[in-house]
Amino acid sequence: MFMPDTRNWRGPHPKDLECFAPRWVPVLQAAVADLSWLLGRGYSSRASLKLVGDRYSLRDRQRKALQRCAASDDACLERRAKRLSPSDLEDRTVVVDGYNVLLTLEAALSGGLLLLARDGVMRDLSAMSAHYRRLRATLPAIELLAEFFASARCSQIIWYLDRPVSNSGRLKRLIQEIVAGR
């Protein structure tokens, strides 16, 4: 079994207190509105992010948050139309983007910054690389997910883990062990 990393990679970032201090909230909200407006009119996301980020003098981490939170009105409507409540999952097969869900939950459990995006989805600022590191929050995160899916009475859960990411096989076995124990 691979040992948990003692560092909280997906926990609070040293720059978060400054980058997301209360004085920045209205600035970031205005930036999200501007970027969303540009995206809704078909402008390039990369060029629009640079334009809006420069206009508001945003730092790299703030730009990353802006990119994760902004969405056109149409994209928001499409995503909200696909949203399901836990009761909708009963007797259904659920497909889980394993790293995406797990990293966000690990960030939350590690005290990392979570953002409520314009489409109503919670997002974190964790980045996935070619190497996955198990954290102290990994086991509790998987247990919470297993508990949620069990309470939602899903008929089957299919986890997708990117094969090129190192430790995917170990993470798969850990998930299987936890789910089998329920």
How should each PLM-predicted stretch be described?
Residues M1-V94, V101-R182:
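Charge-biased, low-complexity intrinsically disordered regions
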